[in-house]
Structures are given as C-alpha cells and as structure tokens.
Design a protein with these regions (language model features):
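Feature captures the catalytic cores and cofactor-binding loops of soluble hydro-lyases/lyases
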Residues: 173-250
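Intrinsically disordered, low-complexity regions enriched in acidic/Ser/Thr/Pro/Gln residues
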Residues: 1-161, 166-167
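Short glycine/serine/threonine-biased micro-segments
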Residues: 55, 170, 198
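Short beta-strand-to-turn element immediately C-terminal to the catalytic PLP-Schiff-base lysine
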Residues: 159, 250-252
Length: 254
C-alpha cells in the first residue's frame, strides 16, 4: 500500500486564556472528508493527527472493506482537508437512497451513496490473560500526552502478545478506535491477535466496529449496554468492561 501524507499533523491543542484569567490547554478540532475512489464517503471531525490511520481504520470498521489488501493508496492533501483512498476494485452501491448518518461522537457523518458493507462475522477466540487487562488499565490510567495536557480526549490502546503495540488519542472515541485499528493495519500485525482498550462507552456501534475489525476482545473502563452485550455474544467478541470487575459478553435478565 502506498501512503502519501502531505499534511502530517497539526497542533492538537492550544493554550487559551479563560474568563477567570487562568490559562488552559484546549484541544483543537479538524474537519476532513474521506474519499474512496474519488467519491466522498465520510466527513470526520477529529484531532489533526494520524489521518491516514483514521481513514483506513474507518473503512474497515464501517464495513467498506474487508481487509487492508483492498487499498492500493492513501493520499492526504497538504491542508489535511481531503483524504483519498484508492481501492483495487470499484464499490458496490446499495439500491437504497443515499443518506447522511450522524455519529453521536463529534460531528462525523457518512456522505454520498451508501455502499454494500461487509456483513458481520464471528471473531476468532483469544485467551485474554488477566495481566493483559491490568497492563492496559495501568497504561490508560497513566494517560497519553494529549489527555494529560487537556483532560478532554479519548484514548484507544492496542495490545498484541501481551505488549502495548500502539496508542491513539482523539476528541472522539470512534475516531480513536479507528486510528488504532488503522495503525495496526499499516503495521501489518493481524488484528485477530490484538486486544483493544477504549476509554469511551461501548454501545452497539463501538462493539460493531470491534467485530468488523476482527479483534477477539474489546476492553473498556466503562460499562456496556444490554444491546452491546447481546451483539458481542452473538459474534463471539469478548467484552471486558468495568474498572475493577470486567464483565464477559454474557448477561442475565434483571
């Protein structure tokens, strides 16, 4: 896969004088449009870093592609306003009318004619060791640089074979997860061997992203919903939630 990034990154936060005279580090927002085969696909509002990773991860977790092997090139313009992904095949459009679907996280929307997305498939099993969850929780508690500066962003860590492979930050939890997934894809590491740890909530859309990424387990310091537990159980995703007492992807009526 060829990668052309003329943008790189911009300042993720600015120091702002508050009304009471104190100064605070405030995160910045960056808007970009992700194009697939020259057609607009998503508008994202994100932290202005790791745009190739965000775009690649977004295509996988939203079901537009089944693997990174379908992507021939990722190109980011100098201003970071346009991210182009070129596939080795045309996209198959749905028969339904086009819609814009807003995300509950930041101001992200899907653009243009929807495509036939990849169906959800059962994820592989992985024996998640208790020490792995502890290591992820410790890393999350320590905080990443942008969070330490602003306390206003989400994080997503990737664990591979017991070691933290990468960690990504963004103003949106969906974006942070997509950046982490994209980073793993660009590194050539099998997602089937990875565990994701998100700082955000895990409703159905986050569980769906993890399933489409093909990871065996998703860990969060927050609690899931009944529906996200059911979806995780249906496709074999280990859902480990809660600071002290992680839940499995099973549930009991109450």
């Amino acid at each position: 896969m060829q990668r052309i990034d003329l943008f790189g990154a911009a300042a993720a936060f600015e120091t702002v004088r508050m009304p009471d005279g104190t100064e605070a580090a405030i995160p910045t927002e960056h808007a970009a449009v992700i194009y697939v085969n020259e057609q607009p696909a998503f508008r994202v509002v994100c932290t202005p870093q790791l745009l190739p990773q965000l775009a690649l991860g977004r295509l996988l977790t939203e079901g537009w592609i089944a693997s990174a092997e379908e992507v021939e090139q990722i190109a980011v313009c100098a201003e970071g306003l346009k991210v182009n992904l070129y596939l080795n095949h045309p996209l198959t459009a749905r028969r339904a009318a086009a819609q814009e679907v807003s995300s509950c996280c930041t101001d992200n929307v899907a653009l243009g004619s929807p495509v036939e997305v990849q169906p959800l498939r059962a994820v592989p099993h992985l024996d998640v060791q208790p020490g792995w969850v502890d290591a992820l929780a410790a890393a999350m508690s320590a905080g990443l640089p942008l969070y330490q500066a602003t306390h206003a962003v989400h994080s997503c860590f990737v664990l591979h074979e017991g070691r933290i492979l990468c960690a990504c930050e963004d103003i949106g939890r969906h974006n942070a997860l997509d950046k982490a997934v994209g980073s793993v894809l660009l590194a050539g590491v099998p997602l089937s061997e990875c565990v994701l740890y998100t700082s955000g909530r895990v409703p159905m859309d986050m569980v769906r992203k993890a399933i489409r990424a093909g990871v065996p387990a998703l860990v969060s310091k927050t609690m899931p919903t009944v529906q996200s537990l059911e979806l995780a159980a249906e496709y074999g995703l280990q859902l480990l939630c809660g600071r002290k007492h992680p839940l499995t992807s099973s549930k009991s009526a109450g």
